[in-house]
């Protein structure tokens, strides 16, 4: 930008040449991304602005999304870092002129850059468009999750114009609440549903209740939700599918019926969201449950809630 006259002379000699004017911040979001975008176009109206910054939290991505949503023309806007990965995946939906991918993991030129194969095959890069509905799994960590691979393969097979994203939401309940508010107030992102896993299942239930959403009875009983439905008008419905899944997995693995769980002695290790669903399911089936957890207080609270026994991890029988 400091060499405006030099740029003008160079472009005048090559009228078919387009200029990309870039600004990067490797430390965090720009102080004023809108003003920076305007400044680039003021200096060189024919240029393609490229604005790239590091997202320290997934919530930092929304500044980039907002700029793409409220501006037109050719521009390149996305975030670097593991928290900014979804901004690369959504380039096609939000109208970014281009995004970047690497040949392989070793060839990545910036943190958070996807490989070409992962971008095209796992995240349907060639099919992403402005009308696409969005889904995703909220977790911390999330990179290990198979949910994007499973759901995106199903979407492609069913010819559904949908994309399932890995949503790394750090910062406990505060980070979760902020993320949910960000997507709900931006209906144009078209988020339709979310899977929720560790450590946010209890956060999900609390958020839906606090914001006037509908909670299915099973999720209310368990005190955790692993599935959120977002209605057309931004309403929320919370569900818990862990209860039925746990019973099906346990009975199938043991080759027994649900009725056979009655009076069966069962050790449950953990006292988080999944453990709550398993304890609720086994309790309803009549099993005799002992909850083992490193944090004794959490084991005590869960045991008291469902009428179970509890113990510390040092008392867990060797398996």
Model-inferred region functions:
Residues 2-133:
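Catalytic alpha/beta core domains of metabolic enzymes, predominantly
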Residues 18, 74, 265, 287-290:
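Residues at the starts of beta-strands that form the adenosine-phosphate
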Residues 36, 146-155, 273, 277, ...:
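Short, solvent-exposed amphipathic alpha-helices that sit
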Residues 79, 134-142, 238-243, 250, ...:
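Glycine-rich adenosine-cofactor-binding loop
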Residues 132-256:
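Phosphate/diphosphate ligand-binding glycine-rich loop within oxidoreductases
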Residues 285-306:
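NAD(P)-binding Rossmann-fold cofactor-contacting core
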Residues 306-319:
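Short acidic low-complexity segments
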